[in-house]
Amino acid sequence: MMSSQRALGRAILYLSIGCGVVGISELNMRAALAADYKEAPSLAKEVAAGKLPPVAQRLPANPLVVKPVDSIGSYGGTWRQALVGASDGLLERTIGYTRLVRWDPKWTGVVPDVAESYSVNDDGTVYTFKLRKGIRWSDGTPFTADDILFWYNDILMNKEITPAVPRWLRSGNDPVVVSKVDDSTIQFNFKSPNGMLLYYLASNIGSDILAGSPAHYLKTFHKAYNPDVDQLVKAAGAPSWVALIQAKVGNWQSPDRWRDAARPVLDPWKLTVPYTGTTQVVAERNPYYFKVDPEGHQLPYIDRVTYDVMGDVQSVILKATNGGLDMQAQRLNSLETGMVLAAHREQGSYKLFKVQPAWSNGMLICLNQTVKNPVLRQVFQNKDFRIGLSLAINRDEINDILYAGQSRPYQAVPRPGTALYDEKLATQYTQFDVKAANEALDRTGFTKRDDQGYRIGPDGKRIAFSIDVQTARKDHIDALELIRKYWKAVGVDMQPKPIEASFAVARMLANDQEGLVWIGGGGYDFLGLLDPKWYFPYENQSAFGSAWGIHYQNPKDPNAEEPPAWAKKQQDLYTELLRTVSDEGKLALMRQILAITGEEFPVIGTDMDPDNYGVVKTNFHNVPDIMPDTAFYVTPGPTNPEQYFIK
């Protein structure tokens, strides 16, 4: 675990309240003099031929200086990767991690990126971002505050394009107001405090702003600016101009924006062959990229990035073991695959780097306390029932059989090494103790048993229920089969219900599930703050109390139910957290939420998700030995792929 996680809000996050400004510090050391800027040989040839302006004219006035992981790199080469099918998110993670602000590499805080600096007022209602002067889109067009205004006025606030403003950009029902201070300064104004904006901007969600900002390009597809847009709609085979521009802008949950090679970007590489779901995707260096290394070399070091489009994950694994991938963790990051990769290191001429799951738990068991069946609802809401089932699980056996001994018993709490880790909560009710399990279950009052030894519920019938499990998660299915056996031994009849993931989600959103197993999020500090759904009823995906979570998001929803006092207390604390500017304040509130989680024990954890691995060729450099693995961190984006090099 990253030891620096305990420094959340201190290490590289230089947030000063009031008139304070976040500086770039050591991650943006003074760049070399403009006369000393260096560029890739391929770009130097284009400059000599008059096809490009000199490198000093392509860089902003104050380029972001990236400190290499190990050493100054050399130019050239192709970074080979592989993705699966037509909906893979790998491009967003590897060549698309450019933001107003970004996570620092060790995930200890937020640092500037396209924004040179930022400041926040005392109550967290006004965020001011100073953009880098002279920064340009990949086609050479200047990027200014007007681009952000286009995203705000013509994409976000256009109800045809964006029917509902995302919650992270609202104060209650009031959307953020974005205004231009000058050509290089933008303000985000909220009616009430927004303590989480910087985190969202740095996460996967934050990509949508810059994707919707190349005004000079997107205006061509916008009816307000192009009266002939219907001709483009017809040529593209789109149903409407709205659908066409939505595809151009895309969103963080879909790869649509990567299907357009003409889209200008601020990323280190720009597409030359788009992502159509067949054969290969190709990206080449962006000659206007705004970052340099400490010696003034314009980044990226690597000339070209390719993605072979594969039909399945096994094909990606085979390509890796045969040496066909230069650096990749996505689609390889499972325990079973890690064992295969380790056995073929010499054959594939690669090393392994560790990708540390950001999950709080390898498999959470959620008994739906708002289930529509009133008998099961009464049973599931009894804390002693949940405690008894937890004590009946032999987690060490599950670890040995399914995780090769690489895991350990663990409940649903943030991981060791994080600021929010709590040893007591992590280990409570994890010991395998059949006697104590039966005692807890007896305290429920369900002591009578039928002729097969199963406990009788309040309706006079056997306590029996199903638990939904994704068909794609063989490890979860196998674990649930073991747990079925453990629970039978203490008189509870549980039947695993394998179901395709989309159907499992649909049942959860409709509050139709009796129980559900899922991997547990919120294992890192930022994830606990951004994605707390397993710690309290936060949303409809809080599968242990879906109707309570719906109530928190929208009390008027017909599926919403008033939560019990303990859950309401957690929801109130989280609402306060969202309005809290300081990191210390947010952490203090989250600890209160987690203390209630520990006391009420709403979900049952099994084992901690073990570490996984990616491959990196022996001639591929500046890749950290360890990095977090989650979509919120946008792995490996914050490790600065632009400073990777091949030699």
Where do the PLM segments sit?
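Ligand-site clamp/hinge motif
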Residues: 132, 255-260, 288-340, 484, ...
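Surface-exposed binding/hinge segments that line
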Residues: 167-249, 626
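Aromatic- and charge-enriched surface segment that lines or borders ligand/interaction sites
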Residues: 116-162, 181, 187-189, 319, ...
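A bilobed periplasmic-binding-protein/Venus flytrap-type ligand-binding module shared by bacterial periplasmic
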Residues: 104, 286-288, 321, 360-384, ...
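A structural "hinge/loop" feature
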Residues: 70-94, 114, 197-206, 376-378, ...
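Detector for C-terminal structural segments
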Residues: 64, 263, 269-281, 285, ...
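Extracellular/periplasmic solute-recognition and catalytic clefts
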Residues: 151, 159-165, 178-179, 272-282, ...
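N-terminal lobe/hinge region of extracytoplasmic solute-binding protein
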Residues: 39, 45-122, 153
